Amino acid sequence: MQVSVETLEGLERKVTVSVPTEKVEEEVSSRLRNLARKVKIDGFRPGKVPFNVVKSRFSDSVREEVAREMVQSTLYEALQKNELVPAGYPHVEPLEIEPGKDFKYTAVFEVMPVFEIVELNQAPVELIRSEVTDKDVDNMIEKLREQNKEWHEVTHAVKKGDKVVIDFQGFLDDKPFQGGSAEGYELVIGSGSMIPGFEDGIVGGKIDKPFDIKVSFPEDYGHKDLAGKEATFKITIKKIMEGKLPALDEAFAEKFNIKEGGIESLKKDIRENMARELERRVNMMNREKLFDSLMSVNHVELPIALIDKEIEHLKHDMYHRLFGHEHKDDEKIPDFPRELFEEQAKRRVHLGLLFAEYVKKHEIVADNDKVNAMIDKFASAYESPDELRAWYQSSKEHMAEVEALVMEDMVADKIAEDAKLKYKNMDYDSVMNPKKGTEKKGE
């Protein structure tokens, strides 16, 4: 067998394999003889069909079968000998499968990039630290009180903090726009859930006294046809309600399943939950910072085949988020625009390549104790921790998910161990509620 390897553009390789005709003909003849012993053809007894008849009738199909199988066996051997690791399925084209000639074919594919990990030992990586303070707990208590206000109807003009039920319709240039109207819409004035100016415009309004307000949609509003535009909203207030904060007493604590200890037990429970969520978020943010820093100093050529595969995974994930998991295995996924997923796919592929190389270089293996500890940590947040443990341990797939998370933590820990680090203190709210240009409702 002769093998030649040609480097094409980037990671693409072209392998040409030539198998001697003697080997091909020997295999073809062997299969035809075996076929002659069992084939049934009209006019001949089973096993008595002349070889030349079998050959004339089945030679082409047997030759194609031999060619397919030889591609599988010889290509694997060629890749092994030349230390080539395909990043995707090779595109194979047979060049010659004629009798009496060597069997030749080409295989074109991308190879996995070969590189050495550059460690983070130069520029410092900034990580964050945070903790739950008494003030954070008090703020959370106040949020819970706000969420549990007792509302009663009033007749006075709307003031900040009131809840209103309104009918409204929005107009652009005196024409109604899609999604700009609602009936019986509940809104707490001052909640900031609507576009700037909308809630302020309702202050002072009275029941069943229609009025108009003019507001402008933010320049970065999610709907491009509305962004930056001035709109008029015709509003009718149907109901005004004033809220009363519940007292901080045992009755309030019992609403959150606190049976003993009253408000102090509630605060303790809230602090523990906040600390657990804060730790999870800080770990996630620091892990992302470490991984991003590792990617920034390790520039790797990414195989298009891996990016394409990851894009398909992301499309599938989006389909599940939009339409649920109940669908047939062969159901066609909508052709979402590729650009929606390309950057995320490239990041995942880049990080995956670095991750695999880092694990190999530092011989990192998922530690069973750490896997069990992570399961215990997950279980501690549930009312029936033993059931959650049993759920993870009942499936190799479930355990593999935890092992992957443990590996991520172990890799992040190792990167941090070798890197130059500096820390930035952040308060609870800045970590848990980072400011985003989120779209607010204006309909």
Swiss-Prot record:
Kind of enzyme, top EC level? isomerase
Report the residue ranges that make up the PPIase FKBP-type domain in this protein: 161-246
- Stored PROSITE patterns: FKBP_PPIASE
Protein's GO biological process: 'de novo' cotranslational protein folding; cell division; chaperone-mediated protein folding; protein transport; protein unfolding
Which SUPFAM superfamilies does the UniProt entry name for this protein?
A: FKBP-like, Triger factor/SurA peptide-binding domain-like, Trigger factor ribosome-binding domain
Q: Where in the cell is it found?
A: Cytoplasm
UniProt keywords (A-Z) are: Cell cycle, Cell division, Chaperone, Cytoplasm, Isomerase, Rotamase
Q: EC annotation?
A: 5.2.1.8
Q: Does the keyword GTP-binding apply?
A: no
For this protein, the record's PANTHER family field holds:
TRIGGER FACTOR CHAPERONE AND PEPTIDYL-PROLYL CIS/TRANS ISOMERASE (PTHR30560), TRIGGER FACTOR-LIKE PROTEIN TIG, CHLOROPLASTIC (PTHR30560:SF3)
Q: Which family does it belong to?
A: Belongs to the FKBP-type PPIase family. Tig subfamily.
* Protein name as catalogued: Trigger factor
**Which organism does this sequence originate in?**
Legionella pneumophila subsp. pneumophila (strain Philadelphia 1 / ATCC 33152 / DSM 7513)
Task: Quote the gene name from the UniProt entry.
Answer: tig
